[in-house]
Structure formats: C-alpha cells, structure tokens
Curated annotation (Swiss-Prot):
This is Glycine cleavage system H protein 2. The keyword Acyltransferase does not apply. The lineage of its organism: Bacteria, Pseudomonadati, Pseudomonadota, Gammaproteobacteria, Pseudomonadales. Coiled coil: none annotated. PANTHER family: GLYCINE CLEAVAGE SYSTEM H PROTEIN, GLYCINE CLEAVAGE SYSTEM H PROTEIN-RELATED. It comes from Pseudomonas aeruginosa (strain ATCC 15692 / DSM 22644 / CIP 104116 / JCM 14847 / LMG 12228 / 1C / PRS 101 / PAO1). Belongs to the GcvH family. Keywords: Lipoyl. GO terms for cellular component: cytosol; glycine cleavage complex. The glycine cleavage system catalyzes the degradation of glycine. The H protein shuttles the methylamine group of glycine from the P protein to the T protein.
Amino acid sequence: MSNIPAELRYAQSHEWARLEADGSVTVGISDHAQEALGDVVFIELPELGKTLAAGQEAGVVESVKAASDIYSPIGGEVIAINEALADTPEDVNNDPYVSWFFKLKPSNPAELDKLLDAAGYQAAVDAEG
C-alpha cells in the first residue's frame, strides 16, 4: 500500500502539491508513482522562470522500466528546481515526499482546491486497479 500523506494535495496524474508558508507550492511525484515506475535513473525538470499551466507537461521521469511525463498540478511560474535530483534521481524512490521536483509561484492558489485530498487520491489509485 502506498504512503499518501494527508497534508498534501494530489493530481490524477500522480503528482503531489504542498502549499508552503511563503505561498509557494512544492511539487513531486507520489509514492504510488515511484512504485509503479521502479528504479528512477533520470529526471528532466522544467526551466527556472518557465510559466506552466495546470496539467501542462513539466518534465520527464525515466526509470529502468519506462519514461513518464510529469505534469504541473497547478499553474504558476517555476521559481526553484531540485538540482540534487540530477545526481541522485534514485532519491525519489527512497522518499518521494522529501525529493521534490520543482516549486511554483502559483498564478491562482485556488487551483489547489481542485486537486484531490488524500482520501480522493487513494480512491483514484484503487480505481486504477
């Protein structure tokens, strides 16, 4: 069973989003996503300063099994990327909720409310079978 922290919000496409005290939003992939991918070997992150729309492709995660697109769960400007993942992409497998991908300055913070809570995300994962 996947770990699904209650304090996060989730996209159907398996990204998580965390609202920070400064109003920024940190984004990563869920435990379920990293389990499905297997051993992560490469991560392509968005460029700093890029403006993303909710649901827009933001990067790619490559594992020994497959390559999977990463989507921005909300719209906003990329204000930070986790450069450590370039050297140690496997950190995502070890702790997907510490190994964030990028941070956004949200264009509309209310978009967070449209994401799934932990129970909703668990139901979506269960529905996938």
